């Protein structure tokens, strides 16, 4: 009988409208995304980058540990030996459509050459734009070097 009276007097509808009115005047919990951005964690794993030393030489020593540890097999490296006997990469490609952003490549790198940067806005309309070559990765590293160095310095104790 009581359920009949509740439905007769539209109790559920009034209760739902009261809840709507309660939240209508409260502060919004969402952000207006392209115009406002939420803070990003220091350990955020975003777009990949290759770093350089202070003298401008690339850090990658072509050890291929990142290629070996990548569970998605998104990294392809080809290396060549230089005149002084050291090895450097001639090709360093990352297929961002395969990458699962696990960070294992960054953890495996003995010289902190490959890192995951702070950028998460790199959507593209074509598949080929998401296959990063060595030049694109070095450009990313040059663009974010200060932020990447600060991030690695803060995280140094935990590595």
UniProtKB/Swiss-Prot annotation:
CC terms in the record's Gene Ontology section: plasma membrane
UniProt key word Lyase: no
Cofactor comment text: Binds 2 [4Fe-4S] clusters per subunit.
InterPro entries tied to this protein: 4Fe4S_Fe-S-bd, 4Fe4S_Fe_S_CS, NADH_quinone_OxRdtase_chainI
Function statement: NDH-1 shuttles electrons from NADH, via FMN and iron-sulfur (Fe-S) centers, to quinones in the respiratory chain. The immediate electron acceptor for the enzyme in this species is believed to be ubiquinone. Couples the redox reaction to proton translocation (for every two electrons transferred, four hydrogen ions are translocated across the cytoplasmic membrane), and thus conserves the redox energy in a proton gradient.
Group of enzyme by EC: translocase
Residue sites binding [4Fe-4S] cluster 2 per the record: 70, 99, 102, 105
An annotated Gene Ontology molecular function: NADH:ubiquinone reductase (non-electrogenic) activity
Annotated membrane topology: Peripheral membrane protein
Statement: the UniProt record of this protein carries the keyword Cytoplasm: no
Protein name: NADH-quinone oxidoreductase subunit I
